[in-house]
């Protein structure tokens, strides 16, 4: 199993999701799959994410002699709606696969939903440090032009290729940092709900969320420069706040009035 590389030494993580962040994400993914006897893969990406990471992942999988089917969703803007979900489900058929999501939020949500509904696992290969939803069980979808969240599953493992994350568009890096900044209000909202309406609350998880926020704000200059140190902090913070939601069983630790 690939180790969870954590910058937050005091974290109490109840969810056993192997997470790797570094320059050897694809070799680590291959090792993880070897150890887990995984040898059939459905690789889901869009044209951009396939070019920056998906093609390398496909080559590495084929080099092992494993079966891989690649689904490249093509459009200027891929949306997690019926059109793209059906494309993935048609490619998957009724066979057993390990799905691999190569992308950021939308690709991950499509893959999360489709893998869950076909009773398969999925692995996440993030391409941008833009959202905290990589570790989530929820899949925000657009159904009949209305946004809804379907309950699905977290990834079996996450392998974050640091050079790819550093090369992500700056607006996506900024979005990820904005997502982290929102935790200040989400924790305030959560505490207010606990005080006024006796909502369920967990102080340890709240502290974990705020520690992730503090670590990222302390390194804002490095994040703005898209340095490896800064982006490693940011993606780890996003993973950590996502895990806080997963561990608590609700989005309260990281989502509120913001």
Regions found by a protein language model. Give the residues of each.
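Residues that form or flank phosphate/diphosphate-binding pockets in enzymes
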Residues: 52-53, 109, 168
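ATP/NTP phosphate-donor binding region
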Residues: 1-98
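Short beta-strand/turn micro-motifs composed of small residues
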Residues: 44-45, 103, 160
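Buried hydrophobic packing segments
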Residues: 111-115, 180, 258
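Active-site segments that bind and position negatively charged phosphate/pyrophosphate groups
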Residues: 205-258
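A glycine/threonine-rich phosphate-anchoring loop and its flanking beta-alpha core
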Residues: 116-215
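A short, small-residue-rich loop immediately preceding and capping a beta-strand
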Residues: 92-128
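Solvent-exposed alpha-helices and their adjacent loops that cap or buttress functional pockets
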Residues: 11-12, 35-36, 91-94, 115, ...
């Amino acid at each position: 199993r690939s180790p969870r590389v954590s910058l937050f030494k005091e974290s109490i993580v109840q969810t056993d999701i192997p997470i790797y962040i570094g320059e050897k994400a694809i070799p680590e993914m291959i090792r993880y799959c070897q150890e887990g006897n995984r040898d059939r893969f459905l690789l889901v990406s869009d044209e951009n994410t396939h070019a920056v990471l998906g093609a390398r992942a496909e080559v590495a999988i084929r080099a092992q002699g494993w079966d891989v089917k690649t689904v490249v969703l093509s459009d200027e803007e891929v949306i997690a709606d019926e059109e793209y979900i059906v494309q993935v489900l048609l490619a998957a058929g009724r066979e057993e696969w390990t799905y691999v999501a190569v992308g950021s939020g939308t690709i991950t949500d499509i893959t999360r939903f489709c893998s869950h509904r076909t009773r398969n696992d999925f692995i996440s290969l993030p391409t941008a440090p833009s959202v905290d939803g990589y570790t989530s069980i929820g899949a925000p979808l657009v159904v009949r032009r209305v946004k809804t969240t379907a309950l699905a599953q977290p990834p079996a493992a996450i392998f974050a290729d640091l050079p790819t994350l550093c090369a992500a568009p700056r607006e996506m890096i900024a979005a990820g940092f904005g997502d982290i900044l929102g935790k200040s209000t989400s924790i305030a909202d959560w505490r207010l709900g606990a005080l006024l309406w006796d909502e369920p609350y967990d102080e340890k998880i709240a502290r974990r969320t705020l520690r992730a926020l503090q670590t990222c704000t302390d390194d804002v200059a490095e994040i703005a420069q898209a340095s490896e140190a800064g982006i490693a902090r940011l993606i780890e913070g996003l993973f950590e706040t996502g895990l806080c939601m997963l561990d608590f069983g609700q989005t309260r630790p990281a989502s509120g009035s913001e």
